[in-house]
């Protein structure tokens, strides 16, 4: 489950980033461009595979990229639950424009102390798209906003994956919403009935030597013993076998542990998956 969730998260993140980078037209570059120390973090699961290609088409304007990243982040974030959006510090509105403004305000405030007039070296901007791009004309503040928006997109992708999965083992087993809760309750009741039946017949068999003495009332005996025998093919043999091997203790313990795990997992709150460069992420 973990590997699958990680893959799905990366696919969502790649889609948002690639659409943002590809939505901006190419811009001209200077005659000489220094690429020493460039930060190109090619993600996994790129389709087509990631590539580092230098040319006139490998450039993108920083302001266009920032706007596109914020739009992509807003589009994905608007589909998250109110709880997830609140956890990210994003407006809980379902209106994409309001969510986009909220994301812009977050990154703007995070990078508030940086200059808006000096153009930074391209090495200050991290490229996370599958295809390499040279980000042109970025001020210190815009570069900071681009990096922080990309990190925010990573968190949005993690929450989107967790939300789709149900957010916990409970969601994976039973699905989300009311239907999942009802299914869990039904399964727990069935397990409880099985445990009760096993415990009852074990206690009764320990008090009596033969199956015919399990209960003295003939009608009740016929109902309980006969019905149980038809269900498992011989209650006394089944119970005797369990008692001799102590297997019933293991079965009861295993079922109880399963119930406890399921109940605990229903209280799990989806947490964003940790990513590299957590120090640059928005909290």
UniProtKB/Swiss-Prot annotation:
Glycosylated residues (UniProt): 31, 95, 105, 108, 137, 147, 277
Membrane association type: Multi-pass membrane protein
Keyword field: Glycoprotein, Lipoprotein, Membrane, Myristate, Transmembrane, Transmembrane helix
Lipidated residues (N-myristoyl glycine): 2
Intracellular or extracellular location(s): Membrane
A GO CC term attached to the entry: membrane
Main localization category: membrane
Transmembrane segments: 181-201, 250-270
The protein's name: Uncharacterized protein L323
